[in-house]
C-alpha cells in the first residue's frame, strides 16, 4: 500500500469504501476499493484472491481495468483505473424534460455490449450490472466496473452501510431462485439499463424481491412453462402468482424507435435460452446507423 496515497473518499461500493488515490511514483490517479469481507477475522479467502487475480487479465477498452491487488492488515484493496463519473450520476444530471441524445444512447449500449461480449467470451459473468457500475469519461467512452467481483465475494443482501443492494436490474431467473444461471443474466440487466438510458427512469423499480418480480410480470406477463420451459419448477416460483397478460414495452419506454424496441424486447425475453446473446445483439439493425468511428473502437 505504500505505493499509493489516498486523496479522498469518493463513494461506498457494494463491498466497502472507495477512495480516489495517487501512485506515489508515477502520479497516476486510481480508484482504490477497500473490500470488507463478512468474516474479518479469517482474512481474505484464497478462492477470492485467485478469482481476483484472473480479473487482471481482462483488458478491453470498455472494461475498467484492475491494475493491482494489495493486502494491508488482512484488508484487500483493489486498485482500478479512475473515472470520475458513473452513469447514474450522469442520468441524474440531465435536466427535467430533457433526455440523453439518441445517438449517445446507441453508442453507450454498443460499448456496454462490447464489454460484456469480451467478458462472456472469457467465461466471466458480471451478475450485478447497474448504472452505478457503468463509468463514463468525457470522451464518450463507457466502461463496465466491478466485473467478476460477485463470483469472488458473493453479492451481499445489504451493503455494509445497510443500504439494500438494488434488485432493479436483476434477471427473473435469479429472482426466482434458479441455481443454474449463465451469461443471459447480464443481458437482462443491460436490457433494463438500455430502457433507462432512453427514459432516465428505472424500468422495473421494485422494493423487494416479490415487488420486483410482479413489476416485471405486469409489464411482460406472468411467465409459465409455455413461454419459459421449467420456470414453474424454479425454487421461488409460486402457482399463486397473479396471472398478468403481456403488455406492450412501447408504453413503458417512450423514447426508442422501432429497432430499439425490437432489440430491447429480445434482451428481455423470459427464457434465458431464447434471450439474445451479446454477440447477436451487436449485429441487430438498431446499430446499423451507428457512427462507424464508434464501431472501430
Curated annotation (Swiss-Prot):
<protein>
    <recommendedName>
        <fullName>Cyclin-dependent kinase 1</fullName>
        <ecNumber>2.7.11.22</ecNumber>
        <ecNumber>2.7.11.23</ecNumber>
    </recommendedName>
</protein>
<dbReference type="GO" id="GO:0010629">
    <property type="term" value="P:negative regulation of gene expression"/>
</dbReference>
<dbReference type="GO" id="GO:0048144">
    <property type="term" value="P:fibroblast proliferation"/>
</dbReference>
<dbReference type="GO" id="GO:0004674">
    <property type="term" value="F:protein serine/threonine kinase activity"/>
</dbReference>
<dbReference type="GO" id="GO:0042307">
    <property type="term" value="P:positive regulation of protein import into nucleus"/>
</dbReference>
<dbReference type="InterPro" id="IPR050108">
    <property type="entry name" value="CDK"/>
</dbReference>
<dbReference type="GO" id="GO:0004672">
    <property type="term" value="F:protein kinase activity"/>
</dbReference>
<feature type="cross-link" description="Glycyl lysine isopeptide (Lys-Gly) (interchain with G-Cter in SUMO2)">
    <location>
        <position position="20"/>
    </location>
</feature>
<dbReference type="GO" id="GO:0010971">
    <property type="term" value="P:positive regulation of G2/M transition of mitotic cell cycle"/>
</dbReference>
<keyword id="KW-0132">Cell division</keyword>
<dbReference type="GO" id="GO:0018105">
    <property type="term" value="P:peptidyl-serine phosphorylation"/>
</dbReference>
<dbReference type="InterPro" id="IPR011009">
    <property type="entry name" value="Kinase-like_dom_sf"/>
</dbReference>
<dbReference type="GO" id="GO:0051301">
    <property type="term" value="P:cell division"/>
</dbReference>
<dbReference type="GO" id="GO:0030332">
    <property type="term" value="F:cyclin binding"/>
</dbReference>
<dbReference type="GO" id="GO:0005876">
    <property type="term" value="C:spindle microtubule"/>
</dbReference>
<dbReference type="GO" id="GO:0045471">
    <property type="term" value="P:response to ethanol"/>
</dbReference>
<feature type="modified residue" description="N6-acetyllysine; alternate">
    <location>
        <position position="6"/>
    </location>
</feature>
<dbReference type="GO" id="GO:0048511">
    <property type="term" value="P:rhythmic process"/>
</dbReference>
<dbReference type="InterPro" id="IPR000719">
    <property type="entry name" value="Prot_kinase_dom"/>
</dbReference>
<dbReference type="GO" id="GO:0046686">
    <property type="term" value="P:response to cadmium ion"/>
</dbReference>
<keyword id="KW-0067">ATP-binding</keyword>
<dbReference type="GO" id="GO:0008353">
    <property type="term" value="F:RNA polymerase II CTD heptapeptide repeat kinase activity"/>
</dbReference>
<dbReference type="GO" id="GO:0097125">
    <property type="term" value="C:cyclin B1-CDK1 complex"/>
</dbReference>
<keyword id="KW-0547">Nucleotide-binding</keyword>
<dbReference type="GO" id="GO:0000082">
    <property type="term" value="P:G1/S transition of mitotic cell cycle"/>
</dbReference>
<dbReference type="GO" id="GO:0005813">
    <property type="term" value="C:centrosome"/>
</dbReference>
<dbReference type="GO" id="GO:0009636">
    <property type="term" value="P:response to toxic substance"/>
</dbReference>
<dbReference type="GO" id="GO:1902850">
    <property type="term" value="P:microtubule cytoskeleton organization involved in mitosis"/>
</dbReference>
<keyword id="KW-0053">Apoptosis</keyword>
<dbReference type="GO" id="GO:0016301">
    <property type="term" value="F:kinase activity"/>
</dbReference>
<dbReference type="GO" id="GO:0005634">
    <property type="term" value="C:nucleus"/>
</dbReference>
<dbReference type="GO" id="GO:0009410">
    <property type="term" value="P:response to xenobiotic stimulus"/>
</dbReference>
<dbReference type="GO" id="GO:1905448">
    <property type="term" value="P:positive regulation of mitochondrial ATP synthesis coupled electron transport"/>
</dbReference>
<dbReference type="GO" id="GO:0005654">
    <property type="term" value="C:nucleoplasm"/>
</dbReference>
<dbReference type="GO" id="GO:0048678">
    <property type="term" value="P:response to axon injury"/>
</dbReference>
<dbReference type="GO" id="GO:0065003">
    <property type="term" value="P:protein-containing complex assembly"/>
</dbReference>
<dbReference type="GO" id="GO:0005524">
    <property type="term" value="F:ATP binding"/>
</dbReference>
<keyword id="KW-0496">Mitochondrion</keyword>
<dbReference type="GO" id="GO:0006915">
    <property type="term" value="P:apoptotic process"/>
</dbReference>
<dbReference type="GO" id="GO:0030855">
    <property type="term" value="P:epithelial cell differentiation"/>
</dbReference>
<feature type="modified residue" description="Phosphoserine">
    <location>
        <position position="248"/>
    </location>
</feature>
<comment type="function">
    <text>Plays a key role in the control of the eukaryotic cell cycle by modulating the centrosome cycle as well as mitotic onset; promotes G2-M transition via association with multiple interphase cyclins.</text>
</comment>
Amino acid at each position: 500500500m505504500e505505493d499509493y496515497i489516498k486523496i479522498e473518499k469518493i463513494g461506498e461500493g457494494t463491498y466497502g469504501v472507495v477512495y480516489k488515490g495517487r501512485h506515489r511514483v508515477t502520479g497516476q490517479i486510481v480508484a482504490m476499493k477497500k473490500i470488507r469481507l463478512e468474516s474479518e477475522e479469517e482474512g481474505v479467502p484464497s478462492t477470492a484472491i485467485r478469482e481476483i487475480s484472473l480479473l487482471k487479465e481482462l483488458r478491453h477498452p470498455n472494461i475498467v481495468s484492475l491494475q493491482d491487488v494489495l493486502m494491508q492488515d488482512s484488508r484487500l484493496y483493489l486498485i482500478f483505473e479512475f473515472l470520475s463519473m458513473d452513469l447514474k450520476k450522469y442520468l441524474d444530471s440531465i435536466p427535467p424534460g430533457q433526455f440523453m441524445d439518441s445517438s449517445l444512447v446507441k453508442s453507450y449500449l454498443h460499448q456496454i455490449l462490447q464489454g460484456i461480449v469480451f467478458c462472456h467470451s472469457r467465461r466471466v459473468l458480471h451478475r450485478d450490472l447497474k448504472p452505478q457500475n457503468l463509468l463514463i469519461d468525457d470522451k464518450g467512452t463507457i466502461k463496465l466496473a466491478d466485473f467478476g467481483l460477485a463470483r469472488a465475494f458473493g453479492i451481499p443482501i445489504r451493503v455494509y452501510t445497510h443500504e439494500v443492494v438494488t434488485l432493479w436490474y436483476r434477471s427473473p431467473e435469479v429472482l426466482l431462485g434458479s441455481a443454474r444461471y449463465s451469461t443471459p443474466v447480464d443481458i437482462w440487466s443491460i436490457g433494463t439499463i438500455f430502457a433507462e438510458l432512453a427514459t432516465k427512469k428505472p424500468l422495473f423499480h421494485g422494493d423487494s424481491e416479490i415487488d420486483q418480480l410482479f413489476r416485471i410480470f405486469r409489464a411482460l406477463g406472468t411467465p409459465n412453462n409455455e413461454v419459459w420451459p421449467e420456470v414453474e419448477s424454479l425454487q421461488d416460483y409460486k402457482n399463486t402468482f397473479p396471472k398478468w397478460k403481456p403488455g406492450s414495452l412501447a408504453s413503458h419506454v417512450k423514447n426508442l424507435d422501432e429497432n430499439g424496441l425490437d432489440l430491447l424486447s429480445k434482451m428481455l425475453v423470459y427464457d434465458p435460452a431464447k434471450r439474445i446473446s451479446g454477440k447477436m445483439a451487436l449485429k441487430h439493425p438498431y446499430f446499423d446507423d451507428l457512427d462507424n468511428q464508434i464501431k472501430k473502437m
